[in-house]
Amino acid sequence: MSTASAASSSSSSSAGEMIEAPSQVLNFEEIDYKEIEVEEVVGRGAFGVVCKAKWRAKDVAIKQIESESERKAFIVELRQLSRVNHPNIVKLYGACLNPVCLVMEYAEGGSLYNVLHGAEPLPYYTAAHAMSWCLQCSQGVAYLHSMQPKALIHRDLKPPNLLLVAGGTVLKICDFGTACDIQTHMTNNKGSAAWMAPEVFEGSNYSEKCDVFSWGIILWEVITRRKPFDEIGGPAFRIMWAVHNGTRPPLIKNLPKPIESLMTRCWSKDPSQRPSMEEIVKIMTHLMRYFPGADEPLQYPCQYSDEGQSNSATSTGSFMDIASTNTSNKSDTNMEQVPATNDTIKRLESKLLKNQAKQQSESGRLSLGASRGSSVESLPPTSEGKRMSADMSEIEARIAATTAYSKPKRGHRKTASFGNILDVPEIVISGNGQPRRRSIQDLTVTGTEPGQVSSRSSSPSVRMITTSGPTSEKPTRSHPWTPDDSTDTNGSDNSIPMAYLTLDHQLQPLAPCPNSKESMAVFEQHCKMAQEYMKVQTEIALLLQRKQELVAELDQDEKDQQNTSRLVQEHKKLLDENKSLSTYYQQCKKQLEVIRSQQQKRQGTS
């Protein structure tokens, strides 16, 4: 065995040769397995089992092969890791020869996949975190692509192969076991199909641009917090067939154009149309200026506290900051159109938002709890979306201008009333006859302005009017008023029916002068008008409530129709796919028959 030959053409060397004399071929430290104290199994890699262990008083990850069939992947990863040295690539400490295993840097944060889609509780993360992860991934891959004398292609980029350290702020690429055995490993790997470039599974010649395609899918995934092509389901070949036919993840609502353009370029069917990883690094580095806070550690729901609400908004992404330092004057019931001043994680489940809206703090911050909403505009209505997808709705404006959008919004006329982010506010007539914007769920009819609350009146709600209206409590007097009815023994005014005391202060009938017939007539007319006014307001409130019920029913009907239409389209699509596959099968069958006949002819002539 020639060491020089093995070093110059390591890819052609046998696995046995390289294991027998790795110190002569590869640049790594040989570690005595007795120095390692294995603690627990933490997962699987491209080959073998990954365990957490202690080595020389520090945490390490050891990757052991389980069978001889994994030995080649082990050699590939050992060879590739011994070549690289980059802050965004997992570090190789050394290898053991008996038993065969790699000793690598331990990532306490686990994989990016588990952070995005793992078991509850899931951490909150901001758009800054999402962009930073993608930037670091691109930096690591760009380093691999720039290696000399021959570029190294990862070929299996996906969140399970991206590890997080330093509180989730630093990303490291791992699993190089597929770097030279793409056909035997990846085409049979269901877990990689969603991120795989079409030219890889099509059997075409591929270059480092296949990593660019995978990176574009990862960018979509960290922004939406959804699994790519999850709605397709079935075996891996269904995803491959869809990607082959041009299917890509749905575009993201409110995603800034520079990010969308970069992402869709990475998805291009033609590898030559995709940007290089070096170009991606330049673009992402430029865009990161608009995403501060990426160095803040990830926060989990159990770490959340009300006391730290105002300080954790920008670092944890646990709520949308409506009244932040730059937009303290912004407050509108239609919050869909209010750009947030920090990069938070937006949870869009409307029912949860409605419950949260009732628990607003007086500081003006709207706390959004974790939900399972999706930021993808064109996803099926019945799909179970992932949690806390990155809110990109206001980044485009910040990219276009370095100063944040600060146009004043119309505020509420009632303090501590915020409306609902996803609901269109209703115009409700207040007691003084002026329109007032309220959220749909808040069906209060009127209310005095702050500072106008009197000892006799308060802001009544529909419920108060319904249960204490003029027809059920004290109706307007129809008989002539007499001085005997004007006051009780304590001198309090009993001339005004109690129902009218729920009216706004300036609308309540005033006690008449008992010695003036004109005053008495005005008072009685005022009482009748007040009664009619209350009836109309009550009817308006009830009609509004009924309207909301009808709107809800209509929405449900539309959802049912959409579901039916979606199922019909999906059925048609499956039929077309079945027909296409059948045609393809027949073509392959004919080709096979032709090949067999040609072989038979050759055998006959020979």
Curated annotation (Swiss-Prot):
Which domain of life does the UniProt lineage start with? Eukaryota
One Gene Ontology molecular-function label: ATP binding
Phosphothreonine sites (modified residues): 184, 187
Annotated active site: 156
Indicate where the modification Phosphoserine is found in the sequence. Answer: 192, 367, 389, 439, 455
In its record, the post-translational modification comment is:
Association with TAB1/MAP3K7IP1 promotes autophosphorylation at Ser-192 and subsequent activation. Association with TAB2/MAP3K7IP2, itself associated with free unanchored Lys-63 polyubiquitin chain, promotes autophosphorylation and subsequent activation of MAP3K7. Dephosphorylation at Ser-192 by PPM1B/PP2CB and at Thr-187 by PP2A and PPP6C leads to inactivation.
Q: Where is this cross-link: Glycyl lysine isopeptide (Lys-Gly) (interchain with G-Cter in ubiquitin)?
A: 72, 158, 209
The segment(s) forming the Protein kinase domain are 36-291
What Pfam families does the annotation carry?
PK_Tyr_Ser-Thr
Q: How does it sit in the membrane?
A: Peripheral membrane protein
| Cellular component GO terms held in the UniProt record | ATAC complex; cytoplasm; cytosol; endoplasmic reticulum membrane; endosome membrane; nucleus; plasma membrane
Q: Which UniProt keywords are given for this protein, alphabetically ordered?
A: Acetylation, Apoptosis, ATP-binding, Cell membrane, Cytoplasm, Disease variant, Host-virus interaction, Isopeptide bond, Kinase, Magnesium, Membrane, Metal-binding, Nucleotide-binding, Phosphoprotein, Serine/threonine-protein kinase, Stress response, Transcription, Transcription regulation, Transferase, Ubl conjugation
Q: Which cofactor does it need?
A: Mg(2+)
Positions with biased composition (Low complexity) = 361-375, 453-463
Locate the region Interaction with MAPK8IP1: 1-300
**Chain intervals for the UniProt region annotation (Disordered):** 301-338, 354-391, 443-493
Annotated catalysed reactions? L-seryl-[protein] + ATP = O-phospho-L-seryl-[protein] + ADP + H(+); L-threonyl-[protein] + ATP = O-phospho-L-threonyl-[protein] + ADP + H(+)
Location in the cell: Cytoplasm; Cell membrane
Q: What does this protein do?
A: Serine/threonine kinase which acts as an essential component of the MAP kinase signal transduction pathway. Plays an important role in the cascades of cellular responses evoked by changes in the environment. Mediates signal transduction of TRAF6, various cytokines including interleukin-1 (IL-1), transforming growth factor-beta (TGFB), TGFB-related factors like BMP2 and BMP4, toll-like receptors (TLR), tumor necrosis factor receptor CD40 and B-cell receptor (BCR).
Q: Which disease is it linked to?
A: Frontometaphyseal dysplasia 2: A form of frontometaphyseal dysplasia, a progressive sclerosing skeletal dysplasia affecting the long bones and skull. Characteristic features include supraorbital hyperostosis, cranial hyperostosis, undermodeling of the small bones, flared metaphyses, and digital anomalies. Extra-skeletal manifestations include hearing loss, cardiac malformations, and stenosis, particularly of the upper airway and urinary tract. FMD2 inheritance is autosomal dominant.
Subunit composition and interactions: Can form homodimer. Binds both upstream activators and downstream substrates in multimolecular complexes. Interacts with TAB1/MAP3K7IP1, TAB2/MAP3K7IP2 and TAB3/MAP3K7IP3. Identified in the TRIKA2 complex composed of MAP3K7/TAK1, TAB1/MAP3K7IP1 and TAB2/MAP3K7IP2. Interacts with PPM1L and PPM1B/PP2CB. Interaction with PP2A and PPP6C leads to its repressed activity. Interacts with TRAF6 and TAB1/MAP3K7IP1; during IL-1 signaling. Interacts with TAOK1 and TAOK2; interaction with TAOK2 interferes with MAP3K7 interaction with IKKA, thus preventing NF-kappa-B activation.
Q: What is this protein called?
A: Mitogen-activated protein kinase kinase kinase 7
The gene coding this protein: MAP3K7
